[in-house]
Swiss-Prot record:
The lineage of its organism: Bacteria, Bacillati, Bacillota, Bacilli, Lactobacillales. Transmembrane segments: none annotated. One of its GO terms (biological process) is DNA recombination. This is Holliday junction branch migration complex subunit RuvA. Keywords: Cytoplasm, DNA damage, DNA recombination, DNA repair, DNA-binding.
Length: 195
C-alpha cells in the first residue's frame, strides 16, 4: 500500500526508526537504523506486511534494498524477521554476490539460517540477483580498474571491510599509480584507517 515515507526521523533505535510524516509517527523496522540520524529529513522506502498479529512496516534506504528484502521473503522458510536479520548482518552487494556464487557455507553465518535454508536461498535466488551484485569493474568516474586494483579491492572486503567502505576509497585508489595488489592494499588500508 505504501511506497515510501518522506519525513523527519524523530527516533532511532537498534531495530527501528520513527518517521514523522506531517505529525504522524510511523514505527518502521530497518536493517540499518543507524544509517539515519535523529532530526534528519529522509525518504524511507516501505514494505507493509499484514499478519494476524498486526501490521508491520519495514523500511529501506533505497529501492534496491527493498527489492532484495522482497526476494528474500520469496524463499521458503524466510520470514520478515529472518530477512531483516540477514540484511542487517551484511551489505546488499556482498549478500547478493554470495547468493549468485552459490556460497551456502557463507550464508549459514547469518542468524536463523541453517544449511537447509541457505541451500534454499541459493536454489530460489541464484541467477535472479544480477542487479544487486557489486560491479567492481568500473568506479563511478568510469575509468577502468586494473587487475591488481581489483584484487586489492576484493582483498579489503575479505579482510572485513564493507562494500560501501571499499567503494568510498576506490576513486582515490584509481588515482594512484601502483604495480601490485599489495601496494594498493597498503594504500587502501591507510585510507580506511583515516576515516
Amino acid at each position: 500500500m505504501y511506497e515510501y515515507f518522506e519525513g523527519i526521523i524523530s527516533e532511532v533505535t537498534p531495530s527501528y526508526v520513527v518517521v514523522d510524516v506531517n505529525g504522524i509517527g510511523y514505527k518502521v523496522f530497518s536493517p540499518t537504523p543507524f544509517a539515519y540520524k535523529q532530526g534528519q529529513k529522509a525518504k524511507v522506502y516501505i514494505e507493509q506486511i499484514v499478519r494476524d498479529t498486526g501490521i508491520t512496516l519495514y523500511g529501506f534506504q533505497d529501492q534496491d534494498d527493498k527489492g532484495l528484502f522482497l526476494k528474500l521473503l520469496s524463499v521458503s522458510g524466510i520470514g520478515p524477521k529472518s530477512a531483516m536479520a540477514i540484511m542487517a548482518a551484511e551489505d546488499s552487494n556482498s549478500l547478493a554476490e554470495a547468493i549468485e556464487q552459490g556460497e551456502v557455507k557463507y550464508l549459514t553465518r547469518f542468524p536463523g539460517v541453517g544449511k537447509k535454508t541457505a541451500s534454499q536461498i541459493v536454489l530460489d535466488l541464484k541467477g535472479k540477483l544480477g542487479d544487486y551484485v557489486a560491479r567492481l569493474d568500473k568506479p563511478e568516474n568510469g575509468e577502468e580498474i586494473s587487475p591488481a586494483l581489483n584484487d586489492a579491492l576484493l582483498a579489503l572486503i575479505a579482510l572485513g571491510y564493507t562494500q560501501k567502505e571499499v567503494d568510498r576509497i576506490t576513486p582515490k585508489l584509481v588515482e594512484i599509480e601502483a604495480d601490485t595488489a599489495d601496494q594498493y592494499i597498503k594504500k587502501g588500508l591507510a585510507l580506511l584507517l583515516k576515516k
